[in-house]
Amino acid sequence: MNGLEATVSSFPSVKDSVPLTRTAVQRTKASVAVLHLGCEKNRVDTEHMLGLLAQAGYRVDGDEESANYVIVNTCSFIEAARRESVSTLMELAVQGKKIIIAGCLAQHFQEELLQEIPEAVAIVGTGDYHQIVQIIERVERGERVNAVTSSLDYIADETVPRYRTTHAPVAYLRVAEGCNYRCSFCIIPHLRGDQRSRSIESILREAEQLAEEGVQELILISQITTHYGIDLYGEPRLADLIRALGKIPIPWIRMLYAYPTGVTPAVVEAIQETPNFLPYLDLPLQHSHPQILKAMNRPWQGQVNDRVIERLRQALPNAVLRTSFIVGFPGETEEHFQHLLDFVQRHQFDHVGVFTFSPEEGTPAYHLPHQVPEAVKQERRARLMQVQQGITFRRNREQVGRVVPVLLEQENPRTGEWIGRSPRFAPEVDGVVYVQGQGSLGSLVPVQITRAEPYDLFGQVVAAPEGFSWSGR
């Protein structure tokens, strides 16, 4: 039994659905709904599919229950994501829906999905979503479509229609797709292909379009954002891209997935010199111990972790550092884990995500000896999160009394309270700021922080003090 069959067999009846991003499209002959699962890179794919459908004459509404077809853009990064995707598919199958399965699960298990889910009328790979209109037309003619290519070289640019699903003031901008690294635990290169970067000119044109739409925060994403341009220009060009984006009239530009080897002095200098580029670094370090990093096929990283973090702290004293770690990797001993705990306590990261190792078929780590028991993985995750919670709470308490810029994203109509984020919080993964006072949706306001909790802040809108920095520097 393969990984997908095991997952499907664990859902004899689907009852536990999860909150999903739901967007639907309709036209006279057939209606199509789109459900988005997974990461923000997957979200961009979803938004392009929606844009293409709208351009072809489909009408965007919001009801997949009455739709003739439901597109599910799936995730297959780890077992938990796969279970979420399969749960959604099985729920729709029980309802008798005609399902179009897109995204990473489709790329990973195309034949198995067609066999196990007869309600699937089409399978669309990660490099094929731009053909969604033609695929639906083929389905409507009675064809069962397998549109999964092994040539993963496509990346959408600013000319491909896009229907954004984020809050109005926030947009993600994908600067590259795919990954040239081969970490032993990661299936992404198999699902997304090797890195291919967009040109600086293409990225700037899309950023300008988003600025015209009123976007206040632009978030750069790719598998390894700090390696942007290597494949296209023969050298990293992130520093040049940062400076170029500094001329775009968007108040906040944030970068996610900044791998430590790419955080060069040139990149740090570009961040220093670009006022609207937030000093927020998301560094997916995965572990600290050299032996575990070697087993992860990241042997270079143990030599640069401390050096990069110290350089960032010196050059950008107000930098916000987020990272993620994997605990319970095969062969991880208590000594290795203690090394990680000490590393986290030493560097006092602002935000940390902790994942337990998920053995993925098709990766070298799946076959490694000395697999760690699930109970030990969970216990280590809890211990690390407990340590980090105290650090994050202390970092948040340091904000009390300060006046910081906050982007207002939601309003509670009953209380008039706003929910927003300061530069130290990225969407979805970090905390929020609860704000009292006057403002408008999608605006940036100065807020004095009055109270802190372990993950969130509370404050009051005030007048901007003299010399106030709208990027939180």
Swiss-Prot record:
Its main location: cytoplasm. Its EC number is 2.8.4.4. GO terms for molecular function: 4 iron, 4 sulfur cluster binding; aspartic acid methylthiotransferase activity; metal ion binding; protein methylthiotransferase activity. Keywords: 4Fe-4S, Cytoplasm, Iron, Iron-sulfur, Metal-binding, S-adenosyl-L-methionine, Transferase. One of its GO terms (biological process) is tRNA modification. Pfam families: Radical_SAM (PF04055), TRAM_2 (PF18693), UPF0004 (PF00919). Its cofactor is [4Fe-4S] cluster. SMART domains: Elp3 (SM00729). [4Fe-4S] cluster 1 binds at residues 39, 75, 104. The keyword Iron-sulfur applies. Binds 2 [4Fe-4S] clusters. One cluster is coordinated with 3 cysteines and an exchangeable S-adenosyl-L-methionine. InterPro entries: Elp3/MiaA/NifB-like_rSAM, Methylthiotransferase, Methylthiotransferase_CS, Methylthiotransferase_N, Methylthiotransferase_N_sf, NA-bd_OB-fold, Ribosomal_uS12_MeSTrfase_RimO, rSAM. It catalyses: L-aspartate(89)-[ribosomal protein uS12]-hydrogen + (sulfur carrier)-SH + AH2 + 2 S-adenosyl-L-methionine = 3-methylsulfanyl-L-aspartate(89)-[ribosomal protein uS12]-hydrogen + (sulfur carrier)-H + 5'-deoxyadenosine + L-methionine + A + S-adenosyl-L-homocysteine + 2 H(+). [4Fe-4S] cluster 2 binds at residues 179, 183, 186. GO terms for cellular component: cytosol. It is found in: Cytoplasm. Gene3D superfamilies: Methylthiotransferase, N-terminal domain, Nucleic acid-binding proteins, tm_1862 like domain. It is an enzyme of class 2 (transferase). Coiled coil: none annotated. Residues 165-394 form the Radical SAM core domain. It comes from the Bacteria. Residues 397-463 form the TRAM domain. Catalyzes the methylthiolation of an aspartic acid residue of ribosomal protein uS12. Belongs to the methylthiotransferase family. RimO subfamily. This is Ribosomal protein uS12 methylthiotransferase RimO. It comes from Synechococcus sp. (strain JA-2-3B'a(2-13)). The gene is rimO.
